[in-house]
Amino acid sequence: MKRFFLYAVAISALCSSCETEDEAFATETNNQTNALHQAKGVQANNYQTYQSILNSFVYNNQQTHQENLLLFEQHVNRQMLNYVPQETYRYEKINMEQLLVLQQADTNFIQQLSYANETKQAIYAIIGNKFNSDMVQLITTESERNLMEIMFALHSNGNGNDNKWNDKRSIAFAYGSQYSFTQAVLYAGAIELLAK
């Protein structure tokens, strides 16, 4: 645990040395918060983790979209090492055939997901902007309740909807979450990369 804390401190010092004073303060504060969460064994907010991983990826317009997807896959897997114990970490790939399906998916795809009916109804409600907090209480598993919290934040994302990606990002996140958080980040992030 000390080793992770020392790595986090070293990385924050390295990253903040090249930034302006305001950026350095924000980055340092954010890294200290993540290090504190890791040191205490508290799981960081998955929505913030998703945003952090996505925002730290630099799309290279000199390369093809396919090459950028591979770089994104590698980036996500490297970043996940900061959020999961190394003993449980395993490299996860984007299945390109599944990504093509998700790029074409609409709300009918939600029925194919392996969640309880209450969770599927909540996903429909989030996408339709009809979600309310009472719906979460109907969901019996903690992992699916956590998914709803993340999806609500992801769908709202400060702008009230996910229309930029025609709800495909939210559907991709829900699909990936069936398997792991890493898969959710990979597929939802890959959908976001389409806009670049």
Q: Model regions: which residues?
A:
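N-terminal propeptides/leader regions of secreted preproproteins
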Residues: 18-163
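Bacterial Sec-dependent N-terminal signal peptides
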Residues: 1-29, 195-196
